[in-house]
UniProtKB/Swiss-Prot annotation:
Organism (species): Aspergillus clavatus (strain ATCC 1007 / CBS 513.65 / DSM 816 / NCTC 3887 / NRRL 1 / QM 1276 / 107)
Main location: secreted
Signal sequence bounds: 1-21
Induction trigger: Expressed in presence of xylan and repressed by glucose.
Descriptive protein name: Probable endo-1,4-beta-xylanase C
Pathway as given in its UniProt record: Glycan degradation; xylan degradation
Pfam families, per database record: Glyco_hydro_10
Keywords, in A-Z order: Carbohydrate metabolism, Disulfide bond, Glycosidase, Hydrolase, Polysaccharide degradation, Secreted, Signal, Xylan degradation
EC number(s) stated in the UniProt entry for this protein: 3.2.1.8
Amino acid sequence: MVVLSKIFSCALFLSLGSAAAIDIRQTSSINNAFKSHGKKYFGTCGDQNTLSIPQNSAIIKADFGALTPENSMKWDATEPSRGKFNFAGADHLVNYAKQNGKLVRGHTLVWYSQLPAWVKAISDKQTLTSVLKNHITTVMSRYKGQVYAWDVVNEIFEENGSLRNSVFYRVLGEDFVRIAFETARAVDPHAKLYINDYNLDSANYGKTQAMVKHVKKWLAAGIPIDGIGSQSHLSQALSALASTGVSEIAITELDIKGANPSEYVAVTKACLEVKKCIGITVWGVSDKNSWRKDNSPLLFDRNYNPKPAYNAIIAAL
C-alpha cells in the first residue's frame, strides 16, 4: 500500500467548493461510467466484516464492479498451520461477489508480510518449494474459474530495485517467481496472473526500472506473467510498466490522503490514457473502515456519503 500526497496541482473544471459540487452519484455509478470508456472495472476491497455493513454493501452493489479481499486470502488467513486451510473469510467474499455480479481479484498468494511463522522458519529448498506449490494449488483450486485475476507475488522489490530479502528469496533465490507463476498457471489457465507492488510512481525510479527489467526478463524466459498491479498514478509510469510486454496493468490498493479530488481525477485519467490499464481498485469504501481512517483517504465519508472526489471522478468521466 502507498498513500499519495499532494502531488497534482491541476484544477478541476468545476468548483468543488461551490454549489456546483452537488452529489451527482445518482447520475451514474462510478463503475459504469469507467467501463463506458472501454475499461474492465472500477473496484474496491472488502471482507466479511465490511461486506456485512448494510450501507457499505449498498455502495458496493451500486458503484463498484470488482472486489479484492482485504485480508481473507492472505497466507496467515488461509493456511495458518501447515496443511490446515481455512477458507471461511475468502468463501464469504467470493460468494458475495458471485451473488452480486462482481469480478474478484485474488490477493495475495506469495507475500513476505502476514506470513505465518512456520513458513518464515523454513530453510530447506525442497521443503519451501513443496509448501509454496501446495499453498498456491490449494487456494487457487478452490476458486478456479471464479477469480478474474490473482496477485501471485506481492511487493517483492525493495525501494532500490533489489529483490526483497524474504524467506522465499533467501531460500529459493529469484526462482521462487518462476515456481509461483508456473504453479498458478497450471492450476487455472484462464485466470490473469499478476505481479503487484507499490511506489512505482515514476518511470525513472529505481524500483520501477527494476520491475520493468525483471518482468521483461521473466517473460522472455517463458514465465507466465499476465499483468502488473501498481499504485502508479502517472500515465508515464503506467506506460513504462505496459512496455514490459504484459497483456494488462491495473491500479491497485489506491487511497489518497485527504481524498484530494484533483489527485483522484488524475489517477483515473492516467488509467484512461494507457490502453493496457484495465481497472482501478480503491482500497476501501468508507473512511470509517479504512486502514488509514485518520487520513480520510477514500471516496465515501464516515457516514457513507459520497465525497467531492467521488463527484469529481464522475464529472471527469
